[in-house]
């Protein structure tokens, strides 16, 4: 099982790299620095199962995504249990989001960010379904130091 899981995690890492390469090439960008942050995996070197967290060893660079509108936090790990939260966390389940949120509000919240993905199939990924940036910033202090907040100019979410 562990062997197959390692192969799957390696495949996922290479797949993410391929997606980044396609986007960077298509937009004519050149990467200055890259790093990878993954969540919901087994760190076989440290034998830590991370569900809802990411590796945050002392000085390790990591990304904490917030939502489609607010962007992400680039952070440096503080070695608090070698982990930090992997994202903002949901305020509501996917089903509850589909039932409670409106496309009109979703469209309004995403104004100013280029995306073709503000569609009914991604309503459960709308900013309103997640905790706020302010709440996350207030809570992550023991786990990670915020280096920079990055804001989206382009957002893509795959739908079924």
Question: Which residues fall in each region the model found?
Answer:
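Domain-length cofactor-binding catalytic modules of enzymes
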Residues: 1-160
């Amino acid at each position: 099982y562990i062997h197959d899981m390692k192969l799957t995690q390696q495949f996922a890492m290479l797949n993410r790299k391929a997606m980044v390469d396609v986007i960077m090439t298509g937009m004519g960008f050149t990467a200055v620095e890259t790093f990878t942050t993954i969540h919901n995996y087994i760190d076989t070197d440290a034998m830590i199962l991370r569900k809802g967290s990411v590796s945050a060893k002392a000085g390790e660079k990591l990304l904490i995504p917030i939502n489609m509108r607010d962007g992400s936090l680039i952070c440096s790990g503080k070695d608090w249990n070698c982990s930090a939260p992997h994202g903002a966390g949901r305020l509501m389940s996917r089903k509850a989001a589909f039932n409670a949120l409106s496309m009109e509000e979703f469209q309004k919240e995403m104004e100013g960010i280029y995306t073709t993905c503000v569609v009914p199939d991604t309503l459960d990924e709308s900013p309103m379904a997640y905790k706020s940036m302010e709440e996350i910033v207030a809570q992550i202090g023991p786990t990670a130091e915020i280096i920079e907040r990055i804001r989206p100019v382009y957002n893509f979410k795959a739908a079924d």
